[in-house]
Structures are given as structure tokens and as C-alpha cells.
């Protein structure tokens, strides 16, 4: 929950912990149904822009306004220290986590346009696509929830906390 919203995204900005660009909004009217949700970090603007799409339509856009103590605009910091990525849960507060289901998860190295988001919404990936960083399909029960390989063969996920699997088609 971010500022009373129940659909949000957060990315790290700058080298200091706690400098994050965050935006959230009330969940769309179709709450409780499957939704295709995409978050895009677009650095084609000098300050960068965070965008979220729901079912192929732009849901929100926020221009980066995160500054350090000296007033210098901070930019997205890639994970050069090889730290674990946290998704759908706050690393310092396990009670702040996602409630819902994830069918597929993809991460790309380049920002996707609105048209690309719409195309990818109804397509699958093999793991060899240019710019695909990682991809998981959570459509069948994993053999080992502490080591779930992605489709690229480069990464593994670990499920933490309470979870349950649903059969495909549910």
C-alpha cells in the first residue's frame, strides 16, 4: 500500500539505500480478474520516467524527481553489486507483500513501447529473445521452490513466504 494505493511499483535510484522512485494508484475496476501488468523504466528522457501498463493501456507515468542531499537528480542504479532482487515483497518488512497470483514474470534490458507491451501481452517467450534478461512461467508446480530456473537459463528464483500453486486454466 503506497499512499493509499494498492497497485504500485518501486525502483532504486542512486547508490544510497532508501532513494526510490515510487508511484501507486487505486487498483483498476476489474479487481479480482487476471490482469497483465507491465512496469517500464524509460530513460529516453534525461530524468527518466516510470510507467505502468495494465492490460496494454498506460495506467500511470511518473517522471523521476528523486534527488540526493545535494539536490542532484538521481538516476536508476543497475545492480552492479549482484545483490538479490526483491519482487512483490518489502525486503525489510515481510508483512508488506503482494496478495495475488503471478502467472508469468519477464524482465527486459530495454524499455518497451506501448505497442510492444500490447504485443507481448498475448505472446510467449522462448528465453532467447534479444534483450530478455529473465523469464519465469509459474504455470505448473515447481520441483524445488528454492531454485526455480528461468527460461534464459541464467537465473533462479526462490519463493519466500506463504504461497500456493494453481493449476493452469484456473
Question: For the regions a protein language model found, what residue spans apply to each?
Answer:
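Extracytoplasmic low-complexity segments
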Residues: 76, 118-170
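Acidic glycine-/aspartate-rich tracts in secreted/extracellular proteins
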Residues: 43-46, 57, 91-92, 107-115, ...
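Extracellular glycan-interaction patches encoded by glycine-rich segments
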Residues: 75-106, 112-123, 170
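Acidic active-site catalytic centers that drive phospho-/nucleotidyl reactions
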Residues: 42, 55, 103-104, 150
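Extracytoplasmic/secreted proteins and extracellular or luminal domains
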Residues: 30, 50, 78, 94, ...
Amino acid at each position: 500500500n503506497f499512499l493509499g494505493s494498492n497497485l504500485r511499483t518501486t525502483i532504486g535510484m542512486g547508490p544510497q539505500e532508501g532513494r526510490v522512485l515510487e508511484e501507486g494508484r487505486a487498483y483498476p475496476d476489474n479487481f479480482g480478474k487476471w490482469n497483465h501488468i507491465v512496469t517500464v523504466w524509460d530513460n529516453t528522457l534525461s530524468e527518466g520516467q516510470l510507467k505502468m501498463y495494465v492490460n496494454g493501456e498506460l495506467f500511470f507515468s511518473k517522471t523521476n524527481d528523486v534527488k540526493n542531499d545535494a539536490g542532484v537528480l538521481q538516476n536508476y542504479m543497475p545492480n552492479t553489486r549482484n545483490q538479490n532482487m526483491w519482487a512483490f515483497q518489502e525486503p525489510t518488512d515481510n508483512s508488506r507483500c503482494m496478495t495475488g497470483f503471478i502467472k508469468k514474470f519477464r524482465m527486459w534490458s530495454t524499455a518497451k513501447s506501448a505497442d510492444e507491451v500490447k504485443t507481448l501481452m498475448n505472446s510467449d517467450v522462448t528465453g532467447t529473445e534479444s534483450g530478455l534478461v529473465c523469464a519465469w512461467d509459474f504455470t505448473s508446480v515447481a520441483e524445488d521452490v528454492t531454485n526455480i530456473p528461468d527460461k534464459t537459463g541464467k537465473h533462479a528464483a526462490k519463493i519466500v513466504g506463504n504461497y500456493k500453486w494453481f493449476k493452469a486454466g484456473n
